[in-house]
Regions:
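His/Glu-rich zincin catalytic helix
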Residues: 1-85, 190-271
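Charge-rich, well-structured scaffold segments of protease-associated domains
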Residues: 1-8, 27, 82-233
């Protein structure tokens, strides 16, 4: 076995035959964009619905996260247990997440069951009811997670860095506190949902072994006509950071067994 000479850098070579598969763009009847990336031989489909709303758009923390999270907790035609049982029966997996600018609904499904699983997903996205009982459970679970995470040094450092960069008046500088969870209720979530979850503010991305039947199912459930309150005006607010002058900040935590260092500055804006 040849011993590597780590004092000599490896040779630099030009990449050959490098290409990235580009998605095809379809414009559905209601104007929603559908991006299709057909690749792979396995009968698996990944479906992503992207909602142009996130932390920057919420009127109070953590409104955006809970609106997204509660989509799976009951609709006008399906209870939370029915949604979970049906997705499990078809071997599908669901992921709900929210970021600074966007909300994401991701479904992984076998292609042969996609007509069934997309029907469940359409009900979740187009007719959620945000039931108070399920919301209370979700809030309690997240409050416990908040209390645990609040003691982690890496979380403390990240929050303090963002507060120094953006300021408390900026959405990226203010994080949810424990009392913010008690202000979350169904009406707060419904307000955010009706404002942003509609066909005029969403786009669809589908990848995997995408057949014409898969595209037809997506168009049938999401592209035939407008859904949601498309008359709502999307607010495009601009927030100005108020950066602290201090370049080095030290936060002491008693009895901490670890330390965390965060370094950050402003870079290129989102394009």
């Amino acid at each position: 076995m040849t011993q590597l000479d780590r004092s000599v850098a490896p040779a630099i070579r030009q990449l050959e035959h490098f290409s990235i598969l580009q998605p095809e763009l379809y414009r559905m009847k209601n104007g929603m964009p559908l991006y299709v990336l057909s690749a792979g031989n396995e009968d698996v489909i990944r479906f992503d619905l992207l909602v142009r709303s996130g932390q920057l758009d919420q009127s109070q923390p953590p409104q955006a996260v809970f609106t997204n999270r509660m989509l799976r907790e009951g609709t006008r035609s399906l209870s939370s247990s029915q949604i979970a049982e049906k997705l499990d029966y078809y071997g599908a997996w669901l992921d709900l997440s929210s970021s600074v600018n966007y909300g994401f609904v991701t479904l992984y499904s076998l292609g042969k069951y996609f007509p069934k699983t997309i029907e469940i997903l359409a009900s979740m996205i187009k007719e959620p009811i945000f039931p108070e009982k399920e919301l209370s459970v979700v809030v309690d679970v997240n409050k416990q997670q908040f209390l645990v995470n609040a003691q982690r040094v890496d979380v403390m450092a990240r929050k303090r860095l963002n507060r120094a960069l953006f300021g408390l008046s900026h959405p990226l500088g203010r994080y949810a506190e424990l009392e913010d969870y008690d202000r979350i209720n169904s009406e707060v979530l419904k307000s955010f949902y009706h404002q942003y979850y509609h066909s005029g503010n969403c786009s669809v991305y589908v990848s995997g072994k995408v057949s014409p039947e898969v595209i037809h199912c997506i168009e049938q459930h999401f592209g035939e006509s407008d859904w949601g309150d498309t008359t709502r005006k999307i607010k495009n607010e601009t927030f100005v950071p108020t950066t602290e002058d201090c370049k080095r900040i030290f936060v002491e935590k008693e009895d901490a067994l670890q330390s965390s260092i965060k370094i950050g500055t402003f870079s290129i804006n989102q394009q």
